[in-house]
C-alpha cells in the first residue's frame, strides 16, 4: 500500500522581474518533512499563499522539488510507464481549484476521455459500464447526456470526483474543491469523500476553510509561509495557527452541519 514521504522538501519560484525594484524569490514550500500513510484522511490547512497547493503539486509529481525528495510507494512521482499508462495516473486522482470539465462535451464524453487516458482504447460497452459505476458512486445517475452548463457547481464537482475515481486510484489529491459551494453541496461532498476514504482511499485535501475541518476532526497538517508548523492526528483548523498568532479564515456553513455532524465524525 503506497505511503507518501517528503524528506526536507523545498520548492522556490522566480516571479516575473519588474522593471524597477529588487528581484525576490518566492517560497512554495520549505524544508517539509511529512509522511502520509495509506488510508489516512488529511486536511492541509493554512492561509492563502501558505504552500498548500504547492505541496499537493509536488506530491502529484506535477512539479519537482528544488531540494529534498518526494516518494510515493518508495518511487519518485513522474512518467514511469506501467501497463500502458503512467504510474502517476495509476496512483492519483486529482481535483484542482478551477473546474476543468470540457464544456462542449457531455458528462459521459468527459468521463470517457478520462477513462481512455487511464486505460487506453476499450470497447464502448466497457467504458459505459465504468462511467455508470462512478456516477452512481457520486450520486449522479443518468446525467451522461447532460452538459456541464446544465448542472450546478456542486454537481460539477461531483462529476470531477467521479472522473478522479475512474481509474480507482489509491490516493485522492483535492485542492480547495469546496470553494464557492453552498452549505448543502459542501455537506454532500464531505459525505462522498468520507465514504471513499472508508473504503481505503487516501484523501489529502487542501483548504482555507474551517468549519467542516473542525467537525470531521481528522488529521490536520497546518502550513504557514511554506513550512509545516503543525501536525495533529485529530485536530481543529485553528489549533496551531492560534498559538502561532497567525490569522485564519472562518467560513460559516449552514447549521445542517451542527444537526448531522455526528454521522460522519469518527
Model-derived features with residue positions:
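Conserved catalytic motifs of ABC-family nucleotide-binding domains
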Residues: 168
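Catalytic Walker B motif of ABC-type/P-loop ATPase nucleotide-binding domains
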Residues: 172-175
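Conserved ABC transporter NBD signature motif
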Residues: 68-79
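Conserved ABC ATPase signature
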Residues: 147-151, 155
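Helix-to-loop junction immediately C-terminal to a conserved catalytic motif
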Residues: 60
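ABC ATPase NBD coupling module
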Residues: 23, 77-93, 124, 198, ...
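Conserved ABC ATPase "signature" region
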Residues: 76, 124-143
Amino acid at each position: 500500500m503506497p505511503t507518501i514521504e517528503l524528506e526536507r522538501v523545498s520548492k522556490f519560484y522566480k516571479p516575473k522581474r519588474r522593471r524597477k525594484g529588487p528581484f525576490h524569490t518566492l517560497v512554495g514550500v520549505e524544508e517539509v518533512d511529512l509522511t502520509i500513510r495509506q488510508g489516512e484522511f488529511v486536511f492541509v490547512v493554512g492561509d492563502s499563499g501558505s504552500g498548500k497547493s504547492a505541496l499537493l503539486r509536488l506530491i502529484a509529481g506535477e512539479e519537482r522539488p528544488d531540494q529534498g525528495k518526494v516518494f510515493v510507494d518508495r518511487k519518485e512521482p513522474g512518467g514511469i510507464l506501467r501497463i500502458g499508462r503512467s504510474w502517476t495516473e495509476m496512483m492519483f486522482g486529482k481535483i484542482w481549484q478551477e473546474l476543468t470539465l470540457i464544456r462542449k462535451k457531455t458528462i459521459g464524453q468527459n468521463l470517457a476521455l478520462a477513462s481512455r487516458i487511464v486505460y487506453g482504447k476499450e470497447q464502448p460497452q466497457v467504458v459505459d459500464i465504468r462511467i455508470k459505476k462512478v456516477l452512481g458512486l457520486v450520486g449522479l445517475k443518468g446525467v451522461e447526456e447532460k452538459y456541464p452548463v446544465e448542472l450546478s457547481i456542486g454537481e460539477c464537482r461531483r462529476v470531477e470526483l467521479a472522473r478522479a475515481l475512474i481509474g480507482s486510484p489509491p490516493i485522492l489529491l483535492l485542492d480547495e474543491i469546496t470553494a464557492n459551494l453552498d452549505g448543502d453541496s459542501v455537506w454532500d461532498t464531505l459525505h462522498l469523500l468520507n465514504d471513499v476514504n472508508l473504503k481505503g482511499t487516501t484523501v489529502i485535501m487542501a483548504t482555507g476553510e474551517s468549519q467542516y475541518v473542525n467537525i470531521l476532526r481528522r488529521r490536520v497538517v497546518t502550513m504557514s509561509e511554506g513550512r509545516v508548523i503543525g501536525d495533529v492526528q485529530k485536530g481543529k483548523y485553528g489549533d496551531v495557527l492560534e498559538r502561532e498568532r497567525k490569522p485564519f479564515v472562518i467560513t460559516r456553513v449552514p447549521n445542517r452541519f451542527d444537526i448531522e455532524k455526528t454521522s460522519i465524525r469518527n
